[in-house]
Curated annotation (Swiss-Prot):
Similarity-based family: Belongs to the snaclec family.
GO molecular function (one): metal ion binding
Organism: Vipera ammodytes ammodytes
Protein name listed in UniProt: Snaclec factor X-activator 2 light chain 1
GO cellular component, one term: extracellular region
């Protein structure tokens, strides 16, 4: 698990924002 904002998705150790 990654510490990302609720609206973000964690993938490959990074956080991506769902546009």
């Amino acid at each position: 698990d990654f510490d990302c904002p609720p609206d973000w998705s964690a993938y490959d150790x990074q956080c991506y924002y769902a546009f």
